[in-house]
């Protein structure tokens, strides 16, 4: 249905209601014209109304700047036209806002830290932006049960810091942790770097408080029990729903004990087959301590080293190191970053010894201590010597020697998205595939650009969460966006994923970018069922419209 026919255009009356409901200081808008003039002193018991200087002394100027920022995603790829952003401080205020919007057919776009990559947190048209950033309190941390209850606007890194002070940690780690909010993480079912150890948010979230489209506050879902086998687990409907069924306002989540020691190891491999074999060995022999397994290709490392200050290639070629020149001439193509942890500091030395033994068994050559780091050295071996030493699936490795060094090594993977911000126009795809097929998509994409003579202007990078089959495919074009570039990528990337029974969205969600691609992974009956659920929770469709449910003539209300 046409957006303008279905939803009301925001009026002065609507803005005045929002001001009365949550206070002028919590409303940013460009609907009501504000003029610079002296603010009148409010009389006792006088009802609050919108006056020109309630937010600033320059009319709507500051609000315009704020709204411009909130109407765009961080990639500056998706843009909305909202003229009003609301900043409630309590669930009750969220309830007032949604009840009014429901009654008046006003579309709403919930927004957290706005770090998403598919346009899910910015308006498609002129929806009112509902920001949760001022609902940012950690309400309780239970030292006995390990359960943390907090509001949706708490920044992930700040929540993790609060837990660390109590000897616990968040079971979720993201590159955007310094800005993303836990409510947005839950609403997108964010995966992150340590899913292999702690599992997804569907398993670690115990309870939610959610405000429905009509203003109903579902506080009864905010349970802290690890076991509850009574009825349907309704909270699961809101995890990953991208704010289309209700607005998450509070979360109860399991906080595991924080590890006391962390060691990062980087391996270098020549083929992706070696990468997969290495991961299998890691899971088989180090499962108890394994907390993350990531991979990135040579193009990703090259971009990071060339772009970000302080980033260094962990394995620079050294002709004077006495290494086998034949091996050095074989370019390393892949890197595997492995994070291992132990809960007791006293166990760190044993873990380090285990890692060294593991590396010796999978990497060509011997190990020696060099310049304070455990570094892989490549002496000459005859073929029969290699056979005696067993199967070798990596070329080099480096083990971190302290926390600072661990962070430096881990940042080689974690900061790739930051480096990509300086690479021009970037086309990002977050997909899940059978592990053995992950990198084939990257290679096929490079071939498609090469046969069209576009491989010089376009770079294709591949990295991701090796432990759960999640590939981040990135195509960058220094000269900016181009229709010809997009035509090479789509729909091929989605066709490939569908052909290999993967998912077009592994962890980023559908947002505005992939909503129509939902048809690729689900049949019509499944999508119709999703639409029925949407209609039940949000019959007027005011919550994050044009997201999650694809448009199709077969999904009109009369056919549901």
Q: Which role does the model predict for each range below?
A:
Residues 216, 514-560:
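Activity-critical C-terminal alpha-helical subdomain
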Residues 28-35, 46-53, 57-68, 267-268, ...:
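C-terminal substrate-recognition/cap domain of FAD-linked oxidoreductases
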Residues 1-40, 45-99, 116-146, 175, ...:
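N-terminal flexible segment immediately upstream of the FAD-binding catalytic core
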Residues 24, 498-510, 535, 539-543:
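Alpha-helix capping/hinge segments and adjacent helical runs
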Residues 137-294, 543, 559:
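FAD-binding subdomain of flavoenzyme oxidoreductases
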């Amino acid at each position: 249905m046409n957006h303008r026919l279905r939803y009301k255009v925001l009026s002065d009356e609507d803005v005045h209601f929002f001001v009365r409901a949550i206070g002028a200081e919590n409303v940013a808008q460009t609907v009501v014209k504000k003029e610079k003039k002296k603010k009148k002193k409010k009389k006792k018991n006088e009802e609050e109304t919108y006056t020109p200087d309630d937010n600033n002394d320059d009319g709507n100027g500051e609000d315009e700047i704020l709204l411009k920022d909130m109407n765009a995603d961080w990639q500056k790829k998706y843009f909305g036209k909202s003229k009003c952003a609301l900043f409630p401080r309590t669930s009750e205020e969220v309830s007032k806002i949604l009840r009014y919007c429901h009654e008046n057919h006003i579309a709403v776009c919930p927004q957290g830290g706005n770090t998403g990559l598919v346009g899910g947190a910015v308006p498609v048209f002129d929806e009112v932006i509902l920001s949760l950033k001022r609902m940012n309190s950690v309400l309780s941390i239970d030292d006995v049960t390990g359960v943390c209850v907090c509001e949706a606007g708490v920044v992930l890194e700040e929540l993790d810091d609060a837990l660390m002070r109590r000897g616990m940690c968040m079971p979720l780690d993201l590159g955007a942790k310094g800005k993303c909010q836990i409510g947005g993480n839950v609403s997108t079912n964010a995966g992150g770097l340590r899913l292999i150890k702690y599992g997804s948010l569907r398993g670690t979230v115990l309870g939610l408080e959610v405000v429905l489209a009509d203003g109903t506050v579902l506080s009864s879902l905010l349970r802290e029990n690890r076991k509850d086998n009574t009825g349907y687990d309704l909270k699961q409907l809101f995890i990953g729903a991208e704010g289309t069924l209700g607005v998450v306002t509070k979360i109860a989540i399991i906080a595991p004990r924080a590890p006391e020691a962390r060691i990062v190891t980087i391996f270098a491999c020549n083929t992706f087959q070696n990468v997969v074999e290495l991961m299998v060995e890691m899971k088989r022999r180090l499962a108890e301590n394994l907390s993350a397994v990531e991979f990135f290709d040579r193009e990703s490392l090259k971009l990071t080293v060339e772009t970000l200050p302080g980033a260094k290639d962990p394995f620079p070629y050294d002709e004077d190191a006495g290494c086998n020149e034949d091996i050095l001439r074989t370019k390393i193509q892949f890197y595997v970053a492995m994070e291992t942890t132990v809960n007791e500091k006293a166990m760190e030395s044993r873990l380090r010894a285990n890692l060294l033994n593991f590396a010796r068994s999978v990497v060509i050559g011997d190990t020696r201590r060099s310049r304070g780091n455990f570094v892989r050295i490549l002496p000459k071996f005859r073929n029969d010597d290699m056979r005696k030493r067993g199967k070798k699936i990596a070329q080099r490795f480096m083990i971190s020697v302290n926390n600072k060094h661990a962070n430096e090594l881990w940042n080689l993977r974690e900061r790739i998205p930051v480096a990509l911000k300086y690479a021009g126009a970037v086309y990002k795809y977050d997909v899940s595939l059978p592990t053995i097929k992950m990198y084939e998509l990257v290679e096929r994409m490079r071939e498609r650009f090469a046969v069209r003579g576009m491989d010089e202007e376009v770079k294709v990078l591949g990295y991701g969460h090796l432990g759960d089959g999640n590939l981040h495919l990135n195509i960058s074009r220094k000269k900016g966006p181009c229709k010809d570039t997009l035509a090479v990528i789509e729909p091929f990337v989605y066709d490939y994923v569908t052909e290999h029974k993967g998912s077009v969205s592994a962890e980023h969600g559908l947002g505005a970018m992939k909503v129509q691609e939902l048809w690729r992974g689900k049949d019509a009956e499944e999508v119709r069922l999703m639409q029925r659920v949407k209609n039940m929770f949000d019959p007027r469709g005011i919550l994050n419209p044009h997201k999650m449910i694809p448009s199709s003539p077969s999904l009109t209300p009369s056919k549901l």
